[in-house]
């Protein structure tokens, strides 16, 4: 009787961006620590990340992150972004922590508590089927952030909605 060859799945790591200070919320707490139904926003994102069963979860936090680190100790590794220079810079802060990791890396925002595991699993599946080097999960909004692409279609930069102009 024949056997079926199953290709091993690549290792998976999740980077969670949790550097927001909550200034637009008029709060001194880290944005990801604001509660929804009695739990910090970051708790929901971590639960979704954990359901992907990654080998590593690395959370990028801001300079005043003691509350976040104490609350989530043991569930994630932390790296700090001391100077906030945008989304791309925040992602780069995880590079050293993942320098010996050779699998797929998925980046999530820590302030997206409504993200569900099924959506992420679908994205991971589509990425693996397509063989894409970069996969973005996006949604249609009235005031979206923007992706600026070069002539070949590669992402050059992320423009936050607050910085976007009509250009």
Where are these regions (language model features)?
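Conserved N-terminal catalytic core of the sugar/cofactor nucleotidyltransferase
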Residues: 2-13, 39-110, 114-118, 122-125
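Hydrophobic residues at beta-strand termini and immediately following loops
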Residues: 36, 79, 158
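A structure-centric signal for secondary-structure junctions around beta-strands
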Residues: 9-12, 30, 102, 131, ...
């Amino acid at each position: 009787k024949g056997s079926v060859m199953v290709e091993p799945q690549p290792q998976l790591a999740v980077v969670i961006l949790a550097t927001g200070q909550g200034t637009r919320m008029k709060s001194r707490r880290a944005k990801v620590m604001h509660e929804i139904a009695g739990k910090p926003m970051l708790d929901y994102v971590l639960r979704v990340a954990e359901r992907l069963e990654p080998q590593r979860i690395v959370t990028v936090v801001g300079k005043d992150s003691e509350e976040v680190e104490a609350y989530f100790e043991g569930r994630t590794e932390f790296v700090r972004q001391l100077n906030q220079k945008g989304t791309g810079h925040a992602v780069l802060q995880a590079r050293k922590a993942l320098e010996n990791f050779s699998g797929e890396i998925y980046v999530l925002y820590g302030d997206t508590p409504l993200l569900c595991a099924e959506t992420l699993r679908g994205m991971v599946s589509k990425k693996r089927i397509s063989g894409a080097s970069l996969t973005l999960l996006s949604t249609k909004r009235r005031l979206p952030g923007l992706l600026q692409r070069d002539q070949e279609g590669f992402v050059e930069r992320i423009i936050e909605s607050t910085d976007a102009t009509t250009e």
